[in-house]
Design a protein with these regions (language model features):
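Extracellular glycan-binding segments that recognize GlcNAc-based cell-wall polysaccharides
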Residues: 1-140
């Protein structure tokens, strides 16, 4: 038996059905916990921002460290996410050739708090123009 009392389902109903969320809720309630939260956005970029915002609000992450990876493929975000987690930070996603609007807004909103930022992957994953846009969003 797992002693889990809280859970977050990441993604909207297209990505994770209500049936799955309901099954998670059933397990949580049976274990004396509360129903799960659903963290999601309009797309994968906004979902990553919602996960970051909610993780910080829950006290399990901080905006002092941000990792940025392409949202067009998963390996860089998956591998980089481990490092971001070790740092107590968050991961944001972007398109390869243009900084996603949701990520840009998050960076601008938290620029004063962000002390460290890593881009996961080379220029084929996150183009130089995006790296420049990230620096501009942070005022660096």
């Amino acid at each position: 038996e797992l002693d889990i009392e809280h859970a977050a389902v990441v993604g909207g109903t297209v990505a994770v059905s209500d049936d799955v969320k309901n099954a998670v809720d059933t397990l949580l309630v049976a274990n004396g916990g509360a129903v799960s939260l659903r963290w999601f956005g309009d797309d994968r970029y906004a979902t990553a921002v919602d996960v970051a915002e909610n993780g910080v609000d829950a006290g399990i992450a901080a905006f002092t460290y941000v990792g940025v990876a392409t949202g067009e493929n998963y390996p860089d975000a998956l591998a980089g996410g481990v490092g971001a987690g070790v740092q107590g930070g968050v991961v944001a996603l972007t398109a390869t050739n243009a900084l996603s609007g949701a990520t840009q807004a998050m960076l601008e909103d938290h620029a004063a708090t962000i002390l460290y930022l890593d881009v996961f992957g080379g220029p084929a994953a996150v183009a130089d123009v995006v790296r420049t846009a990230i620096a501009e969003a942070l005022g660096w």
